[in-house]
């Protein structure tokens, strides 16, 4: 019970904040929670994507093959897909500070162990089958730990921010994975270039420790635990009488509401439009994680040094921020709430960027252009195909079920991509004078084909609209 109680949501504090100080204290603590969640999750992503930076040097060292790296990478995504659902449910009833810090601590530890294993391996040579299995287990643990990051940060916004401004702060938080991915490519890429691939993991572990410290210092579980009233009362959204009346009404209507919710959720699973979008998102995730995971290796194959290659790929992450922000503006203002046309345009742009990246040669300008276009396109597609378009065609009460289906399919496809891409890359690898050369033609067909399918499938939903429930 002691372990479970450690993660239990904090109860109200006996020490109350004086009325005249409540507004000032509340605004300070809620902003700290937002900053801690955003920075903390950005550093989660550094611990998640470090392996993407070092695949080329690992292959050249002969420590692991592309097939083995693909299998290890897929373990993280499979575990993340399963853990995201489970930990999302657990986080709702947890102390979000401790929950989020615990996940990042474990993730930092797995990166440290991977790096130390690499340092030890320099005197051993190629990894044995047993060591590969152990690394798969280690990265599975990392995937599960990574799934403990998103929910606490989002729940923090829900517990501390009123509905009237929550969306604005959620928009800023949504850029955290782009920030983390960009930091990973720049920071870890520099360490790899200076000190070797093992130190890329060391850098990720250090970033994780920094994130844990920030979360523990600045994230707060809920207003009540700090001697404040609940957020609805603090912000004037509701009176105590309204809160009590709603609680009583919910208790009285719980049985019928539960039955209705189950029927609505069943209808989502029978909705072919949701599955078209889930598959579309899955194929988009194939292309997304292909470049995120193997893009540095592609550029190294063109002759770029690791540090330069990681800098170029990081541009994709930074531009993704603008793509995400742009997606909402475009659909709401320019297209009057229509997601399908901008998603189609972004899908075509995504394919064009992949073709330029894979077959545009070794010009820095051309590859930078490809990453700019891809970042903008992926930012839009993650927002639309990754969930919003599915939410648009189901009853409001079934939004969570639709998002769950899309998310699960997306990560299953992304995980499988890592395995298949690794096998195809190994098949395209030749050794000339002791140096490995990789032909990306076959795997490039896979990535481009997936991107094409991802923008064709949503066309089957062109005239579908949300059911007003």
Residue ranges and their predicted role:
Residues 105-128, 348-362:
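C-terminal ends and interior cores of transmembrane alpha-helices
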Residues 138-179:
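Cytoplasmic helix-loop-helix junction between adjacent transmembrane helices
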Residues 51-55, 271-325, 382, 387, ...:
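Extracytoplasmic gate region of multi-pass secondary transporters
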Residues 14-27, 226-276:
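Juxtamembrane intracellular "pre-TM" segments in multi-pass secondary transporters
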Residues 337-388:
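C-terminal transmembrane helical hairpin of 12-TM major facilitator-type secondary transporters
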Residues 49, 77-85, 181-182, 317-325, ...:
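Residue-level signature of mid-helix packing/kink "hotspots" within the transmembrane helices
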Residues 173, 177-224:
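Helix-loop-helix hairpin linking two adjacent transmembrane segments in secondary transporters
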